[in-house]
Every structure is written in C-alpha cells, then in structure tokens.
A protein has these predicted regions:
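N-terminal leader/targeting segments and the immediately adjacent pre-domain N-terminus
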Residues: 1-134, 162-165, 192
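Non-transmembrane alpha-helical segments in soluble domains
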Residues: 59, 156, 172, 188-191, ...
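Active-site-proximal loop and beta-strand segments within enzyme catalytic domains
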Residues: 101-102, 133-138, 142-143, 147, ...
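Active-site SXXK
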Residues: 118, 139-166, 190, 249-253, ...
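Catalytic-site signature segments of enzymes, centered on catalytic residues
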Residues: 125, 137-138, 202-286, 292-296
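Active-site helix/loop module of the DD-peptidase/beta-lactamase fold
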Residues: 161-198, 228-231, 257-300, 315-320
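Active-site-proximal alpha-helical segments within enzyme catalytic domains
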Residues: 245-252, 296-318, 382-391
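Active-site Gly/Thr loop motif
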Residues: 275-277, 282, 331-390
Length: 391
C-alpha cells in the first residue's frame, strides 16, 4: 500500500558510494519508507469507549491488530487445523441493507455477514477507500475474545468425545494447578467466569503486583502464569471476566486429550464446521503440552467464522451431544451484575449483554433474557450473534 508511505533515504547513506563496504553494512541497498499517516498512538490497544480516532489511526490500529502477527512479529507456533476436503458452501440470496452500507462507508466496520433461513442475505466488506484494501475473503481475522467462545465449543466436543466427563467435572487431576485457587474447581465455574479470582485478575490484567505484563501473552505458558497464583485463595463465586479462566479451560482440554488434542480441534472445525481455510490457536513457542502451551487467540476467515457459527446452530437445532452442551450452558447462564459492579466502582464487562453462559454473551439489550440468543464478543467490535430458535 504505497499510497500510505513515502520513500526516504537513510541519512548515513547519502555520503556513501555503492562500492563502499559500509554501503551494504548500513543496508543502503534496500528501500526505506516512512508512513505519511497522522496517527494518534496509544500505550496499548485503542480504547473502545469515548474516543473518536481519525482514519489514519484506525488504519494503524487495524494493522497492529490483524497484520502485525503475520509481518512484524510473525507467528512461529500454532495449533493449526487444515481445511476440510469438502468445505460447506453457502447459498446466497442477497438483499441491500442501507443501514449497513452507511456504517461501512462512515465507520470502522470492516466486514458484515447475515445468515438467515439457510442462506446469506447480507455480505459486505468495507469499501476499498476505507478498509477493503486490507481484507479479502481469505484474510485470517484475529478473534480477540471471540476465541473464548471457540474454546467453549472445543470443550463441548471434548466432553462429547469422552475426554472430560461433563461440565461439572472438577479440575482435581491436573498437577499444574495444584496449590492454587483453581484446583478442584468445577469446569463450569471457569467457563462461567465464576472462579473466585476477582482479587487477582480482571480481563487480561493482573490486579496484584506481578512481573508479568498480563495473562494472555502468547510467549508465556500456563506453568509460567500459574506461578503467580501459588497459595491463592478462592473468593466469592461471582462473575469476573478473565482471559486466564479461558486459558485454563483450553489447556485443561489439552491436558485431558494429550496426543489427541489436535484431533479434537479437527473434529470441531474441520469435520463439524467444514472450514474452507485453515484456522488456528496460538501455541507458545519453546514450551510443551505438559507446561500448557495452548493460547486462546484464534484466527479464521470471515466465512469460516460463519461456518463455525452455523455448526453451533446446527448442533442446537439437531439436539446433538454438543447441542445439549450448548443448551446446558444457556440454561445455567448468570448475570454479569454490571449495575452492581458499577455502583461499587468495579469494572464492568460489555454492558450491551447483561448475561453470560459458558463463554457466550447472553441477555442482549432489547431481547428477552429467556430467549436463546447467544453471542461472541471480541475487542475491537467483533460480534457473532446466534438466534438459536429463529434462525
């Protein structure tokens, strides 16, 4: 995208001849560019609320968010699932949605798909003069917290394949977490973010002094992280949004499945969802399965995310074993207690959904909380919402 940069010459190169040994040593034979964007930089991710970034800042944030893992800091290890030999092919009956068109033209919305009555009815990508030049149908998109729901779906398959007894199985057979608040907890308490760890973690952050930056660094394994929780004590079993709970769930599946972990991933995404392109979770480099080297950050194409969501819908509507798992976690959904947390000055989690069900968002604003509508929400405005009985 040369329109975003301008070619420059390194200062030291201006005084060197091409025959000078220092010419190559200083990389003067290479082209150098600097961006011509007006970017507002943030210490971490761009805040999700109360900011009005310009287009250039959004371009940079999208690069950092989605392209940096493949370019500046390439992913070297991953748990990757190959495409299905018979991928699911969608039928389409497209209609125009003026509201969605306007959002794509005016906002940072990158991609929008609507699937109803067995077919895609809206299929849009941001215009080329916005973000369309950075995304194609085979572009792998970063999940952020949508990876939490992917982990839950894998857990359902691990249970249905007999590796884990049920959602109430206790984590009392995993030596890695002994002498921590997580030992002997029910799997479902971790899935529902009710581990009693509110004094220690929130979202991706440690609340107590720590030498670690956060709980979702792809270069750190569970053995490293769990050392921060030695001799920790369980607190109240209330909703506490934490990436670490999900990291534990994924790595407990890894522990229970052992050499068959990749088979469970294939069962979930290749056989069930019939993905067209590969999908993957991060894998911690220089680590091992015994140390807990799976990471919940997930990547898939826009259509493969839809294929996975459709597989969930099919499981529910066909009352499969995994469908029963999805129904069970919905029946045992909890309130996120955002109002109570706000009154006492605590952090609240995405207030447009007031309930939580095993790594799914529930009780969306304007929708009856008894209605089985569950969704996935990831940082940066990612949403996959499934109406299980009306789709």
């Amino acid at each position: 995208h040369y329109e975003l940069v301008e070619k420059i010459e390194k200062e030291i190169c201006k005084s060197l001849d091409k025959g000078d040994p220092k010419y190559n040593t200083n990389l003067c034979h290479l082209d150098f560019y600097k961006n011509n964007l007006k970017i507002k930089f943030y210490d971490n991710w761009i805040p999700e609320e109360n900011v009005k970034p310009n287009y250039d800042t959004l371009v940079y944030e999208f690069f950092k968010y989605n392209e940096k893992p493949f370019t500046v800091r390439p992913i070297v290890k991953k748990y990757e699932v190959d495409p299905s030999s018979n991928p699911y092919e969608f039928n389409s009956n497209l209609i125009r949605d003026k509201y969605i068109d306007k959002q794509l033209e005016k906002t940072a919305l990158v991609s929008y798909l609507r699937f109803e009555d067995g077919q895609i009815t809206v299929d849009k990508i941001s215009p080329n003069d916005r973000f369309g030049k950075f995304i194609k149908n085979d572009t792998k998109l970063r999940s952020m917290s949508v990876g939490k729901t992917m982990t839950s779906y894998v857990a359902g398959h691990a249970i249905c394949e007999g590796y884990i007894d049920n959602i109430n199985s206790r984590l009392n057979d995993w030596p890695l977490i002994e002498n921590t608040l997580y030992y002997d907890q029910k799997l479902f308490d971790l899935l529902n973010m009710q581990a009693g760890d509110e004094k220690y973690v929130w979202s991706s952050d440690f609340l107590l002094p720590s030498n670690l930056d956060g709980v979702d660094d792809r270069t750190k394994d569970i053995k490293v992280y769990i050392s921060e929780f030695k001799n920790s004590k369980k607190g109240k079993s209330e909703f506490n949004y934490s990436a670490f709970s999900t990291q534990l769930v994924l790595n407990y599946i890894l522990f229970k499945t052992g050499d068959n972990f990749e088979k469970i991933l294939e069962k979930t995404f290749k056989e069930k969802a019939k993905i067209k392109h590969s999908v993957f979770f991060y894998r911690v480099p220089g680590s091992s399965k015994e140390r807990g080297n799976a990471n919940i950050m997930f990547f898939a194409t826009r259509y493969d995310y839809l294929r996975i969501a459709k597989a969930m819908l099919d499981d529910w509507q066909n009352d499969t074993c995994v469908g029963k798992y999805l129904k069970t976690i919905f029946e045992n959904r909890i309130s996120k207690d955002n109002d109570k947390k706000e009154r006492r000055g605590d952090s609240r989690q995405w207030h447009f959904a007031r309930g939580y069900a095993g790594q799914f968002q529930t009780h969306y604003t304007g929708i009856n909380k008894k209605r089985p509508v569950m969704g996935m929400h990831g940082r940066g405005g990612q949403h996959i919402v499934i109406d299980f009985e009306r789709s």
